[in-house]
């Protein structure tokens, strides 16, 4: 165990620490998180429009008219379909904050650059036609959402890097001292803003002269498609989970670090399922953000709900009994920092093995269930990750009982994996407590005799 701890401390932790502190990954994570409140709000209306209750659709049609579902889709589209737009601003804002430059100006410039990179063409089907034509003059809503997420990420980081380099080299317009700070800041952004817009405009013109036709197409082919294949595969998902758990083992927030890389892929897959779910079509994706939040990591990273319940019900040592009482409440809402750092799992080889193995098992089992059709796929509904299991599995699948059943199976399997390791750890803690009592008891007896 000491050898394992030494390897973790000397080899893994320095690398993991540098990754965790990488400002671009942090900005990606924090910028995309900015979209979450909107997605959850949109998911609320998506659930209302697709409640799995017999006669519900007929009742709504009689009460609100035949177009009731289309009207409920308005807020869904307004929240989901600006994911890329919000990310373009949010990522640039967070990255500029980390560089210590004006974040608001950086976000606004990134937003303009993202719109500049987007072709203003929308598909249109004329009456009697058999093929869509592209009509200019309109912003394509689809490219403002998850389909434009990779372009938004790249432009946000590139534009902010250009912005901060020019600012840090002091190549800016300086206003007199009497000018209000807000006005002065806006003029400071003129030169870096012009540089960003000019470069993105030039890049768009160059790409339009190629078979790719747009920056969105070239990013999709060269970056989006390969990463989506990786993130949408069983092997890629297993690797992502293993890396996440190893980072946690070093005391780093693995979910945030890995999420900074994988979230764009999994959110894009979520939105693809949402679109298919709204249209009543077969759901195309299995590996979405909800797949991991709802089915894989039940109780928090490492699928530790089963471990906490075991601790609460079966612990013999005083320390584990007390920790189980404290941790069971948060664990129901998928918060497990109390046991990761309090048990601890961090830097603990005895518990590290099941902590890594358990989510790999739940990934595999859930994938088998969904790929065979025995379990419903996530319907693109952004159920909050803090929602307790069973309820979350039911809602995330659009009201399918199989989603809740799969969660129950994963909890049971997690218990089987964790139990023998927990028993060893609890036995060790119990022995330490008994040894401590044996040491303290003679000392207490001697004190009494001395007093007499």
Swiss-Prot record:
Keyword Cell membrane: yes
One GO BP: phosphoenolpyruvate-dependent sugar phosphotransferase system
Entry keyword annotation includes Transport: yes
Membrane-related topology note: Multi-pass membrane protein
Organism domain of life: Bacteria
The entry's keywords: Cell membrane, Membrane, Phosphotransferase system, Sugar transport, Transmembrane, Transmembrane helix, Transport
Domain PTS EIIC type-3, chain residue ranges per copy: 8-421
Location in the cell: Cell membrane
Database matches in NCBIfam families: cello_pts_IIC, lacE
PANTHER family, A to Z: LICHENAN PERMEASE IIC COMPONENT, PTHR33989
Function, as annotated: The phosphoenolpyruvate-dependent sugar phosphotransferase system (PTS), a major carbohydrate active -transport system, catalyzes the phosphorylation of incoming sugar substrates concomitant with their translocation across the cell membrane. This system is involved in lichenan transport.
Comment text on domains: The EIIC domain forms the PTS system translocation channel and contains the specific substrate-binding site.
Protein name per UniProt: Lichenan permease IIC component
UniProt organism field: Bacillus subtilis (strain 168)
Lineage, uppermost ranks: Bacteria, Bacillati, Bacillota, Bacilli, Bacillales
């Amino acid at each position: 165990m000491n050898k394992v701890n030494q390897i973790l401390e000397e080899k893994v932790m320095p690398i993991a620490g540098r990754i965790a502190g990488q400002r671009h990954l942090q900005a990606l994570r924090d910028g995309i998180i900015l979209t979450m409140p909107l997605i959850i709000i949109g998911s609320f209306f998506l659930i209302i429009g697709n409640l799995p209750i017999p006669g519900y659709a007929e009742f709504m049609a009689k009460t609100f008219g035949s177009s009731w579902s289309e009207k409920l889709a308005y807020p869904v589209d307004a929240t989901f379909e600006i994911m890329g737009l919000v990310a373009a601003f949010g990522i640039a804002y967070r990255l500029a904050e980390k560089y210590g430059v004006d974040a608001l100006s950086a976000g606004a410039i990134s937003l303009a650059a993202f719109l500049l990179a987007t072709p203003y063409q929308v598909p249109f089907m004329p009456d009697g036609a058999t093929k869509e034509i592209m009509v200019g003059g309109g912003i394509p809503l689809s490219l403002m959402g998850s389909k434009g997420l990779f372009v938004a990420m790249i432009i946000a980081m590139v534009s902010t890097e250009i912005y901060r380099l020019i600012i840090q080299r002091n190549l800016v317009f300086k206003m007199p001292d009497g000018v209000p700070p807000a006005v002065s800041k806006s003029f400071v952004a003129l030169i870096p803003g012009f540089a960003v817009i000019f470069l993105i405009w030039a890049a768009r013109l160059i790409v339009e002269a190629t078979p790719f036709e747009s920056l969105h197409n070239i990013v999709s082919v060269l970056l989006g498609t390969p990463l989506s294949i990786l993130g949408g595969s069983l092997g890629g998902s297993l690797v992502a989970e293993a890396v996440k758990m190893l980072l946690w083992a070093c005391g780093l927030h693995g979910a945030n670090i890995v999420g900074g890389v994988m979230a764009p892929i999994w959110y894009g897959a979520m939105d693809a399922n949402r679109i298919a779910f709204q249209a009543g079509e077969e759901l195309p994706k299995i590996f979405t953000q909800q797949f991991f939040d709802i089915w894989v990591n039940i109780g928090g990273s490492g699928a530790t709900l089963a471990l906490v319940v075991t601790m609460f019900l079966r612990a013999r040592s005083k320390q584990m009994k007390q920790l189980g009482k404290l941790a069971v409440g948060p664990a129901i809402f998928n918060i497990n920092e109390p046991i990761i750092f309090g048990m601890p799992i961090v830097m603990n080889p005895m518990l590290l093995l099941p902590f890594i193995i358990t989510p790999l098992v739940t990934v595999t089992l859930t994938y088998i269930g969904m790929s065979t059709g025995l379990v419903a796929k996530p319907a693109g509904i952004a159920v909050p990750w803090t929602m307790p299991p069973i309820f979350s599995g039911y809602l995330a699948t659009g009201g399918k009982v199989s989603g809740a059943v799969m969660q129950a199976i994963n909890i049971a399997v997690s218990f089987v994996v964790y139990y023998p390791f927990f028993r060893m750890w609890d036995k060790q803690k119990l022995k330490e407590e008994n040894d401590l009592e044996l040491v303290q008891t003679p000392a207490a007896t001697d004190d009494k005799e001395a007093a007499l």
